[in-house]
Amino acid sequence: MAAQVATTKVPEVRDITRIERIGAHSHIRGLGLDDALEPRQVSQGMVGQLASRRAAGLILEMIKDGQIAGRAVLIAGQPGTGKTAIAMGIAQSLGPDTPFTALAGSEIFSLEMSKTEALSQAFRKAIGVRIKEETEIIEGEVVEIQIDRPATGTGAKVGKLTLKTTEMETIYDLGTKMIESLSKERVQAGDVITIDKATGKISKLGRSFTRARDYDAMGAQTQFVQCPEGELQKRKEVVHTVSLHEIDVINSRTQGFLALFSGDTGEIKSEVREQINAKVSEWREEGKAEIIPGVLFIDEVHMLDIECFSFLNRALESDLSPVLIMATNRGITRIRGTNYQSPHGIPIDMLDRLLIIATTPYTEKETRQILKIRCEEEDVELSEEAHTVLTRIGQETSLRYAIQLISTAGLVCRKRRGTEVQVEDIKRVYSLFLDEARSSQYMKEYQDSFLFNETQTSQMDTS
């Protein structure tokens, strides 16, 4: 009788790779300044705009100090001169602790809530509260876990947990909930854990170095830590950083914390905000909390109307106000909601409160360097001739159009099994995709063939 050999099918293990989308400003890492706030020509993804970046560096230092709130900055310049890039550079330089909220001018117009409510929520999102509290924790290395289960299978489980430090060892009695928490965290002998006495939360810090030579199958993510020193019970200061908007939402209704995840916050009453402001001020006086004025960035600010600007004038005078950064590419244009014209479409009384940073068009050398950085970001290799042609296109049309041709030319290159984008690839995508000037010329030539053409000089005789 032939022996049957059992074959075990080994499941295929796939690595989960992190997907990072490449955005228009994903190459920006900071403002590219040295310690003396002097801008480098090319640094952290920023190119040129030396005076604008130096001014933004001063604003950045003012934000980091956190002492001055309610200041407003306007970044004004032609399209494609790096206004949003400077704002993103400020955001990257601030770090994770300082709140940064970005929105476009048209985002505040909604049927669900009023314009002033949308602006109020944006302001509150950009103000952080650092709350300090002291908690008692038990920190030690697990020596042994004993769990006694009832013989009948029903009833409460009880057990004992032995913890030790370098100086002492103690046995704790365990209840049902603590046993479930230990099982959930998969705590075993040799683990270094912390237990929050107030909440009963168990956190596993890692494995003890004394167990490093054990013959256990451990994954690459296993961390080895020293056995804790001193007493088992310690007092630890925990710092929580939340925004004022999150506190507003949680206190606005029952089960308000669920609205933080769903995004359905709705309009929040002013009485709730006043109570929260009073409570936060009380915490500040007691030393329990610290206010972190963040940054609110409003792009395309000319889209706001006269009512929004009136609200901003009042909101900037509050002591709980972030640093407001705005950007616009408009010249002298009509203020939305009125028949009056003003520089950048912003009322004069609002302009009087602003520090204005001007951006200038990029030179050919700077355009070439920006395109080189974008090619590295999008993982596209260009030949020297193709780089020169693309730079000329960027100078004659716009920088955004030239950047958009990089990925399309890279795709054309891959389709022909090439490794480096050549001039022919640039020419092909240039002929396929029109820029603004060629599109306008095309419309002028064939305007009579399009429906609802409003530029026709002759009217049809309907008599």
From Swiss-Prot:
<dbReference type="GO" id="GO:0006357">
    <property type="term" value="P:regulation of transcription by RNA polymerase II"/>
</dbReference>
<dbReference type="Pfam" id="PF17856">
    <property type="entry name" value="TIP49_C"/>
</dbReference>
<feature type="binding site">
    <location>
        <begin position="77"/>
        <end position="84"/>
    </location>
    <ligand>
        <name>ATP</name>
    </ligand>
</feature>
<dbReference type="InterPro" id="IPR042487">
    <property type="entry name" value="RuvBL1/2_DNA/RNA_bd_dom"/>
</dbReference>
<dbReference type="GO" id="GO:0007507">
    <property type="term" value="P:heart development"/>
</dbReference>
<dbReference type="GO" id="GO:0045892">
    <property type="term" value="P:negative regulation of DNA-templated transcription"/>
</dbReference>
<dbReference type="GO" id="GO:0044458">
    <property type="term" value="P:motile cilium assembly"/>
</dbReference>
<keyword id="KW-0378">Hydrolase</keyword>
<keyword id="KW-0804">Transcription</keyword>
<dbReference type="GO" id="GO:0016887">
    <property type="term" value="F:ATP hydrolysis activity"/>
</dbReference>
<keyword id="KW-0233">DNA recombination</keyword>
<comment type="subunit">
    <text>Forms homohexameric rings. Can form a dodecamer with ruvbl1 made of two stacked hexameric rings. Component of the chromatin-remodeling Ino80 complex. Component of some MLL1/MLL complex.</text>
</comment>
<dbReference type="GO" id="GO:0006338">
    <property type="term" value="P:chromatin remodeling"/>
</dbReference>
<dbReference type="GO" id="GO:0005524">
    <property type="term" value="F:ATP binding"/>
</dbReference>
<dbReference type="GO" id="GO:0031011">
    <property type="term" value="C:Ino80 complex"/>
</dbReference>
<keyword id="KW-0067">ATP-binding</keyword>
<dbReference type="GO" id="GO:0006281">
    <property type="term" value="P:DNA repair"/>
</dbReference>
<dbReference type="Pfam" id="PF06068">
    <property type="entry name" value="TIP49"/>
</dbReference>
<dbReference type="InterPro" id="IPR027417">
    <property type="entry name" value="P-loop_NTPase"/>
</dbReference>
<dbReference type="InterPro" id="IPR027238">
    <property type="entry name" value="RuvB-like"/>
</dbReference>
<dbReference type="GO" id="GO:0060420">
    <property type="term" value="P:regulation of heart growth"/>
</dbReference>
<dbReference type="GO" id="GO:0035267">
    <property type="term" value="C:NuA4 histone acetyltransferase complex"/>
</dbReference>
<dbReference type="InterPro" id="IPR003593">
    <property type="entry name" value="AAA+_ATPase"/>
</dbReference>
<keyword id="KW-0227">DNA damage</keyword>
<dbReference type="GO" id="GO:0006310">
    <property type="term" value="P:DNA recombination"/>
</dbReference>
<dbReference type="GO" id="GO:0120293">
    <property type="term" value="C:dynein axonemal particle"/>
</dbReference>
<comment type="function">
    <text>Has double-stranded DNA-stimulated ATPase activity. Has ATP-dependent DNA helicase (5' to 3') activity suggesting a role in nuclear processes such as recombination and transcription. Represses gene activation mediated by beta-catenin. Proposed core component of the chromatin remodeling Ino80 complex which exhibits DNA- and nucleosome-activated ATPase activity and catalyzes ATP-dependent nucleosome sliding. Involved in the endoplasmic reticulum (ER)-associated degradation (ERAD) pathway where it negatively regulates expression of ER stress response genes.</text>
</comment>
<dbReference type="GO" id="GO:0003351">
    <property type="term" value="P:epithelial cilium movement involved in extracellular fluid movement"/>
</dbReference>
<dbReference type="InterPro" id="IPR010339">
    <property type="entry name" value="TIP49_P-loop"/>
</dbReference>
<dbReference type="GO" id="GO:0000492">
    <property type="term" value="P:box C/D snoRNP assembly"/>
</dbReference>
<dbReference type="InterPro" id="IPR041048">
    <property type="entry name" value="RuvB-like_C"/>
</dbReference>
<dbReference type="GO" id="GO:0000812">
    <property type="term" value="C:Swr1 complex"/>
</dbReference>
<dbReference type="GO" id="GO:0097255">
    <property type="term" value="C:R2TP complex"/>
</dbReference>
<dbReference type="GO" id="GO:0005634">
    <property type="term" value="C:nucleus"/>
</dbReference>
<dbReference type="GO" id="GO:0003678">
    <property type="term" value="F:DNA helicase activity"/>
</dbReference>
<keyword id="KW-0539">Nucleus</keyword>
<dbReference type="GO" id="GO:0048565">
    <property type="term" value="P:digestive tract development"/>
</dbReference>
<keyword id="KW-0234">DNA repair</keyword>
<keyword id="KW-0347">Helicase</keyword>
<keyword id="KW-0805">Transcription regulation</keyword>
<protein>
    <recommendedName>
        <fullName>RuvB-like 2</fullName>
        <ecNumber>3.6.4.12</ecNumber>
    </recommendedName>
</protein>
<dbReference type="GO" id="GO:0005576">
    <property type="term" value="C:extracellular region"/>
</dbReference>
